[in-house]
Amino acid sequence: MNVTETLNEGLKRGYSITVTAAELDAKVNEKLSEAQPEIEMKGFRKGKVPMALLKKQFGQKLLGEAMQETIDGAMAKHFEDSGDRPALQPEIKMTNEDWKEGDDIEVAMSYEALPEVPDTDFSTVTLEKLVVKADEEAVNEALQNLAENAKSFETKEGAAEDGDQVVIDFLGKVDGEAFEGGAAEDYPLVLGSNSFIPGFEEQLIGTSAGEEKNVDVSFPEQYQAEHLAGKAAVFECKIKEVKAPKAAEIDDEMAKQFGAEDLETLKGQISERLEAEYAGAARAVMKRKLLDELDTLVKFELPPSLVATEAGQIAHQLWHEENPEVEGHDHPEIEPTEEHNKLAERRVRLGLLLAELGQKNEIQVTDAEMTQAIMAQARQYPGQERQFFEFIQQNQQMQQQLRAPIFEDKVVDYIFELATVTEKEISKDDLQKAVEALDDEV
């Protein structure tokens, strides 16, 4: 086997690989020898068929496999010897197209190598860690929200208002005929909750207990029950009771409803939860600042193919966000802009840097972290958690999609430990502004 370099410009590499006919023949013989013990043929005992006969019978069929394995082996040896890591799958092309059995195989291989990522002194990176304390106002606001969620309804006299609860019997009809699922008795409906068909709840505002009212509505065009979608309906309603909302008293009893021993304990739990939320938001801000610093600080050549692929994906994603009515790929080719290319360069540079740093420092995603991530995703599919878990276990691509952000965050945390970080206490509003500013940046 002979490997000759034909191109070495920047990260672009090209090689000519020659596999001799003798090497190819040896590979065919090797595969036949592996299979020989299991082959049966008329006139011979199992495993005793002569090699010459096996070659005549099966040699031609094994030739293609032998060619592929020989070329793959040559590539693997080249990458081991050279230390190159291809950015994408190498392009392989057989150059002697008039090849026939008995000839040497001549192959052209080209690829872009991943660049050498320079070592970086992360102690020169200066970052600000924003700190927000949960003040009394924020805790009281959270308590008010909990009290609202724990509210009860008490019977009232007079007409129903927005926010009141009406207890109703109803019977729905389309074209004068009742339909399945369109009737209920003693149904508690909070007006303004938008839990019914659009236009339904508004028509019950102003009604009183004992009143009967026909509610005219139209089912949405995208209604889940296709036989009702877009159709006009009349609901015969009997208002049996009108109730006004009453917020829960913010006291020890309410605290117990939420699993706390008393009100002070609940306040402490709320404070901890709020500060955990603030810390998560502050980390996102600090991470963005870190990535901005690294994008400026660390420079190295980027594989053009990776940048082009990333730019194409960015352009495609943004186009679909701007044209949500278009599904699939039935649209004109989308050309990346200069802005897309700049964003792609940033993503590729940071991606290669973080990947290299994680590999050098043996940063890994643990099985426990993966399980936690899968379970968090599975909660989005109530009742189907087991099926989702099994689907992820059998899908390497989905596993990688879950693993990648965990790995990135662990590498970022590693850099945080090395960087020069100072704390700065700010208000909740200032933190909110800092988070909102992230959307305005790259």
UniProtKB/Swiss-Prot annotation:
<keyword id="KW-0697">Rotamase</keyword>
<dbReference type="InterPro" id="IPR027304">
    <property type="entry name" value="Trigger_fact/SurA_dom_sf"/>
</dbReference>
<comment type="similarity">
    <text>Belongs to the FKBP-type PPIase family. Tig subfamily.</text>
</comment>
<keyword id="KW-0413">Isomerase</keyword>
<feature type="domain" description="PPIase FKBP-type">
    <location>
        <begin position="163"/>
        <end position="248"/>
    </location>
</feature>
<dbReference type="InterPro" id="IPR001179">
    <property type="entry name" value="PPIase_FKBP_dom"/>
</dbReference>
<dbReference type="GO" id="GO:0003755">
    <property type="term" value="F:peptidyl-prolyl cis-trans isomerase activity"/>
</dbReference>
<dbReference type="Pfam" id="PF05698">
    <property type="entry name" value="Trigger_C"/>
</dbReference>
<dbReference type="GO" id="GO:0051301">
    <property type="term" value="P:cell division"/>
</dbReference>
<dbReference type="InterPro" id="IPR005215">
    <property type="entry name" value="Trig_fac"/>
</dbReference>
<keyword id="KW-0143">Chaperone</keyword>
<dbReference type="InterPro" id="IPR036611">
    <property type="entry name" value="Trigger_fac_ribosome-bd_sf"/>
</dbReference>
<dbReference type="GO" id="GO:0006457">
    <property type="term" value="P:protein folding"/>
</dbReference>
<keyword id="KW-0131">Cell cycle</keyword>
<dbReference type="GO" id="GO:0005737">
    <property type="term" value="C:cytoplasm"/>
</dbReference>
<dbReference type="InterPro" id="IPR008880">
    <property type="entry name" value="Trigger_fac_C"/>
</dbReference>
<keyword id="KW-0132">Cell division</keyword>
<comment type="function">
    <text>Involved in protein export. Acts as a chaperone by maintaining the newly synthesized protein in an open conformation. Functions as a peptidyl-prolyl cis-trans isomerase.</text>
</comment>
<dbReference type="InterPro" id="IPR008881">
    <property type="entry name" value="Trigger_fac_ribosome-bd_bac"/>
</dbReference>
<dbReference type="GO" id="GO:0015031">
    <property type="term" value="P:protein transport"/>
</dbReference>
<keyword id="KW-0963">Cytoplasm</keyword>
<dbReference type="Pfam" id="PF05697">
    <property type="entry name" value="Trigger_N"/>
</dbReference>
<dbReference type="InterPro" id="IPR046357">
    <property type="entry name" value="PPIase_dom_sf"/>
</dbReference>
<dbReference type="Pfam" id="PF00254">
    <property type="entry name" value="FKBP_C"/>
</dbReference>
<protein>
    <recommendedName>
        <fullName>Trigger factor</fullName>
        <ecNumber>5.2.1.8</ecNumber>
    </recommendedName>
</protein>
<dbReference type="InterPro" id="IPR037041">
    <property type="entry name" value="Trigger_fac_C_sf"/>
</dbReference>
